[in-house]
Swiss-Prot record:
Keyword Cytoplasm: no
PANTHER family: FIMBRIAL USHER DOMAIN-CONTAINING PROTEIN YDET-RELATED, OUTER MEMBRANE USHER PROTEIN
Gene Ontology BP, a term: pilus assembly
Record protein name field: Outer membrane usher protein FaeD
Any one of the GO CC terms: cell outer membrane
Length: 812
């Protein structure tokens, strides 16, 4: 084995070397020698005073001691690690597998079989071929050179991190007031992490001048991931059913395969978009249940972060300042994903209907899917004493022709006046044209008149009741998206829905009702040198032949003024019966936390309007406020706040954060505020804690920004890797070491500088570094060095000052 010792002066992170010391370091750094060879030090000023025995000891063995080393693997930095060198390591450094794994070095057991010390349970890496271990005492660095065959990839079957015990509340609240109305909305997601379980619940509340106040508190749901099955077990408030037959809320238990436990699986997120003629409140409901409510400014908007738990149309209501409502329905069509060959999915659920369901008795559902080469098969069923249904589906890849799915369902519903059975068929096709990058999609569904999905079934009704309403017959959805040469992107989609004739018993039907509704939406967007242009339009026709349409255009231009970045924008919108309105404004930011905007224009009624908004992205919450004024609505305002409150017993702290992700890490650098990470926003609080978002079931690397650490603090490891389960709160402490740094200029009792090359040792005889020219000695040490010995003289510990400033000191 060859060991190298490079004679460099110690360079602490917090110090800058003088030109003289840099030159000295360079000269000494070129004087690397192989152990066993003699080095003539007489050519270096003061080198003749170096003790040959000390020099030989440093070159011939690893000096026992505790070192904070800079680790590198094959020339790549791997962070800092604490290295304990024992007397047994004096000739051969032996590293445990735990130490290597913590450092991110994964070695092949077969390659290093000859170097494994079974007694000490560690690896002598240099016993394997082509391996070099370079431990430089003077710079406290450890360089490992290991061939590719000696390394293995990061283990795939690593243990999941279920996190630590925690309780959190993710909250969102907004309120507005104006001449005609005052309203407020608030929601809270509650989660408690207990062992491998996550207990969740939610609450919403809304109220206003209209007296339509509501409060909803959902029963808890306890979930946990089961790795052996790659499945989620849920107990409590669950949903039982499937996407085609429908579903209902239940109090029970479910076990579902979760393919997102493997990286790369993405889900579908619906988008709800529209146009607001002025500052408005947008409310989303499904099956009579409030999903979401928020204030939006004038112009086009989109809402993309509302989760859906049951199938069915989503109703979007836009309420303006003048109290007028605009209602829009979003027909949803879901296409099941294709499974990889050999991959399977399953779901089993059972429970009693919740308070929002009309069903009586227990509900049981089961489904299974399996992936073949280019083909996915699915089947399922839902059973209740009054409703039973079965479904089957197939998804096939057609190569150049795209992909197609076909699903069918058959259900029997038992009403008060007898049972009725029906069927439903659904077809979907999608294709991405490689040559033009055109995206195409078409879907069609049809159901018989007597088919009733579980979501809308009420066993207390009569089939012949007049309030049964019109029943959907078939529905078409088609869409195309087309980017053009990187200049602009075009998207167009349309839908048509047909109904069976409504019952004439006890109800009124318009004579011109043709039983068919249609709609179309489109958008065109482009961005050229930072300038963005967006065009949008939509139109619909109801079953009586009445048309409705709207269109909008907006442009955004960035500019710089007084070394600050701003963005100016202008938009115009028009709709049938809503007039034409336009607005213009400018936005900017004072820093990375505070942003603002102001502008004005004309609303759809011809009156002028103006607005002022501001937002603050703090470490503990996100705040937003808007002030509006218009001739028709007067002065109005709205405010909103969102954030998270997280209590972690392991941290002995309650943290307020704007991070509201489901899966998070609590980074801790004990009692060290102001520390940042490279993968998130914010900085540690007074207790050294910071909440950082993570991706569940995937490798996450959290790295400390070492530039934000205090000068007296070093970390044993600057990054950690973790694979968290969904909704886990991972406690991630970083061991902080208070490093003692000394910059000394040492003189002997006769006033002469201590000769260069003289080694300094602590009270335990551990090497600390050597003296450079003009008696300069730089020391970094984790433990208090005690008295320092420099050859024949000594520096008492009481005379040492832990400071970055140069200390002149005379040794005894």
């Amino acid at each position: 084995m060859k060991k190298y010792v490079t004679t460099k002066s110690v360079q602490p992170v917090a110090f800058r070397l003088t030109t003289l010391s840099l030159v000295m370091s360079a000269v000494l750094g070129s004087a690397s020698v192989i152990a066993g060879e003699k080095l003539d030090m007489s050519f270096i000023q003061g080198g003749g005073g170096v003790n040959p025995e000390v020099w030989a000891a440093l070159n011939g063995s690893y000096a026992p001691g505790r070192y904070l080393v800079d680790l590198s693997l094959n020339g790549k930095e791997a962070g800092k690690q604490i290295l304990d060198v024992t007397p047994q390591d004096s000739n051969e450094l032996c590293l445990t597998e735990a130490w290597l794994t913590k450092a991110g070095v994964y070695v092949s057991a077969d390659y290093f079989r000859e170097g494994y010390d079974a007694t000490r349970q560690c690896y002598v890496l240099t016993k394997a071929p082509s391996v070099k271990v370079d431990f430089d005492v003077s710079t406290q660095s450890l360089a490992l050179s290991i061939p590719q065959k000696g390394l293995v990839k990061m283990p795939e079957n690593v243990d999941w991190d279920y996190g630590t015990s925690a309780f959190r509340v993710n909250y969102n609240a907004n309120a507005n007031t104006g001449r005609n109305n005052t309203s407020a909305f608030g929601s809270a997601d509650l989660k408690a992490n207990i062992g491998h379980w996550v207990v969740s619940s939610s609450a919403t509340a809304s109220g206003g001048d209209s007296g339509d106040n509501s409060t909803t508190i959902n029963m808890f749901t306890a979930t946990r991931a089961i790795r052996a099955l790659s499945a989620d077990l849920a107990v409590g408030k669950t949903s039982t059913g499937d996407s085609l037959l429908g579903s209902t809320g239940t109090y029970g238990v479910s076990l579902s395969r979760n393919n997102s436990m493997k990286p790369g699986n993405l889900g579908y997120t619906p988008v709800f978009s529209g146009i607001a003629n002025g500052p408005s409140r947008v409310t989303l409901t499904q099956n009579g249940r409030l999903l979401h409510s928020e204030m939006v400014p004038a112009g086009p908007f989109s809402i993309t972060d509302v989760p859906l738990y049951t199938s069915g149309d989503v109703t979007m209501k836009i309420t303006g300042e003048d109290g007028r409502d605009e209602v829009q329905n979003f027909p949803l069509s879901v296409m099941a994903g294709q499974l990889s060959p050999g991959q399977h999915e399953f779901s089993v659920a059972a429970g009693l209907p919740d308070d929002d369901s009309d069903l009586k008795g227990g509900v049981f559902a089961a489904s299974y899917g399996y992936g073949l080469d280019g083909l996915t098969l699915r089947a399922g069923g839902v059973f209740n004493q009054d409703w039973q249904g079965a479904s089957a589906g197939v998804v096939a890849g057609l190569g150049y022709l795209g992909a197609v799915s076909a699903d069918g369902a058959y259900a029997t519903a038992k009403y008060r006046d007898g049972s009725h059975s029906g069927n439903k068929v659904q077809l979907s096709w999608s294709k991405q044209l490689e040559t033009t990058n055109t995206g195409l999609r078409v879907s069609w569904s049809r159901q018989s008149e007597e088919y009733e999905g579980m979501s809308s079934f009420d066993p207390t009704e009569l089939w012949s009741q007049s309030n049964h309403g019109r029943r959907t017959k078939d529905e078409w959805n088609a869409g195309i998206s087309q980017p053009v040469g990187g200049l602009f992107s075009l998207s167009v989609s349309g839908w048509q829905r047909s109904y069976y004739p409504a019952s004439m018993t006890g109800s009124y039907r318009y004579s011109d009702d043709n039983g068919k509704e249609t709609g179309i939406t489109g958008s065109l967007s482009t961005q050229i040198k930072g300038v963005s242009l967006n065009l949008g339009w939509s139109g619909s026709r109801n079953s009586r032949g009445e048309n409705n349409w709207s269109a909008s255009a907006s442009v955004s231009v960035p500019f710089t003024l007084f070394d600050r970045r701003y963005s100016s924008s202008a938009s115009v919108s028009t709709s049938k019966g809503g007039g034409t309105g336009f607005s213009t404004g400018v936005s900017g930011s004072l820093n990375d936390r505070f942003s603002y905007g102001l502008g004005g224009g004309r609303d759809g009624d011809g009156g002028t309007s103006s607005y002022l908004n501001a937002s603050y992205s703090g470490d503990r919450a996100y705040l937003n406020g808007v002030l509006n004024h218009s001739q028709s609505g007067g002065t109005s305002g709205s405010v909103s706040v969102s954030g998270s409150v997280l209590a972690v017993p392991a941290a002995k702290d309650i943290m307020f954060s704007r991070t509201t992700g489901d899966t998070v890490a609590v980074v801790n650098v004990k009692d060290t505020p102001g520390v940042k990470v490279t993968s998130g926003d914010g900085q540690t609080d007074s207790d050294g804690n910071l909440v950082v978002p993570l991706n569940s079931y995937d490798w996450n690397t959290v790295t400390i920004d070492t530039g934000t650490l205090p000068l007296s603090t070093e970390l044993t490891n600057t990054s950690q890797k973790v694979v968290p389960t969904d909704k886990a709160v991972v406690w991630m402490p970083f061991d902080a070491l208070k490093v003692k740094r000394y910059l000394l200029q040492v003189k002997q009792r006769d006033g002469e500088f201590v000769p260069g090359g003289t080694w300094a040792r602590d009270s335990k005889n551990t090497p600390l570094g050597f003296v450079a020219n003009n008696g300069v000695l730089m020391i970094n040490t984790v433990d208090a060095p005690g008295d320092i010995t420099l050859g024949q003289c000594r520096i008492p510990a009481a005379r040492l000052q832990d400071t970055e400033k140069l200390q002149e000191i005379t040794c005894e």
